[in-house]
């Protein structure tokens, strides 16, 4: 009897751990159309290892139900294989958030960048919060926390703070790594991993994070039942972006937000009243001038 009880407790603890470990529902694709004459099995193994890493790692101390997992995608396009274990290419990261009381999911994050990394076939990827084991693990862990930060910010004001801080911890460790790759330093350009998390944690971007909460929780989440009220809340949230743009017109985080939401905003405000249309279009063309022609679609009659 005691053995059965112990066995039950062991199974319970293991199953609880697996539930806690599944914050992300991450689909991974590794492609290599430009790489010829290589054993394709290494890319299949890499894809499997990355998917296992993202979906099985315990990223938070919270318990997620299966339906609460955050949907995300990672696509790695290998353009060059340098030696047997070194790769060069691009990585694209996308994440989505379900909208309350609807079947619609809104894009939260969509970004693509260059990446160089080493990977040994059949070697598991293991996250270490106190050191950088490899650039691939660092990049994947960084974006796992960024995805969590973005998601949590939409459910509570600055709710993702601790996850952006964890992403910044990875930036700091990567900077001091003896094998540091590009993308981790302020000197590696103005749009990279360093600047993204710097933006999200810097006080002058508080207005963006306020917008993220208002846009999603008070806007999108109420639109199914109260479309006018939800749309008005979204319009109001955009004023926070205008405030940021006037202070930091080259904000990387603002650019990423607009890239993720541009088409959605057009769809939301096209059926709105003329006065609301005009106000929103004027605001969006100010903060996103290179896409002003796209926003004119909002003014079309429907």
Predicted features and spans:
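Positively charged n-region of N-terminal signal peptides that target proteins for export
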Residues: 1-5
């Amino acid at each position: 009897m005691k053995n059965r009880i112990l066995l039950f407790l062991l199974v319970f603890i293991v199953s609880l751990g697996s539930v806690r470990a599944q914050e992300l529902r991450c689909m991974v694709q590794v492609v290599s159309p430009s790489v010829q004459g290589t054993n394709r099995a290494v890319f299949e193994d890499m894809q499997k290892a990355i998917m296992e890493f993202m979906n099985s790692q315990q990223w938070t101390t919270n318990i997620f139900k299966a339906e609460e997992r955050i949907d995300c995608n990672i696509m790695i396009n290998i353009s060059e294989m340098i030696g047997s274990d070194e790769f060069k290419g691009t990585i694209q990261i996308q994440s989505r958030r379900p909208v309350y009381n609807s079947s619609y999911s809104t894009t939260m994050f969509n970004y693509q960048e260059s990446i160089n990394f080493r990977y040994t076939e059949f070697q598991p990827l293991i996250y270490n919060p106190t050191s950088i084991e490899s650039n691939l693990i660092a990049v994947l862990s960084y974006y796992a926390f960024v995805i969590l930060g973005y998601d949590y910010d939409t459910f509570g004001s600055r709710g993702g703070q601790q996850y952006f801080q964890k992403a910044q911890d990875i930036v700091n460790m990567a900077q001091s790594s003896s094998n540091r790759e590009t993308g981790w330093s302020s000197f590696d350009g103005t749009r990279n991993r360093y600047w993204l998390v710097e933006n999200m944690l810097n006080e002058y971007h508080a207005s963006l994070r306020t917008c993220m909460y208002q846009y999603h929780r008070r806007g999108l989440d109420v639109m199914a039942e109260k479309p006018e009220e939800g749309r008005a809340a979204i319009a109001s949230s955009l004023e926070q972006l205008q405030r940021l743009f006037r202070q930091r017109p080259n904000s990387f985080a603002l650019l990423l937000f607009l890239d993720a939401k541009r088409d959605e905003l057009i769809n939301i405000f096209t059926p709105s009243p003329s006065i609301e249309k005009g106000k929103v279009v004027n605001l969006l063309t100010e903060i996103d001038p290179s896409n002003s022609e796209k926003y004119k679609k909002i003014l079309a009659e429907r």
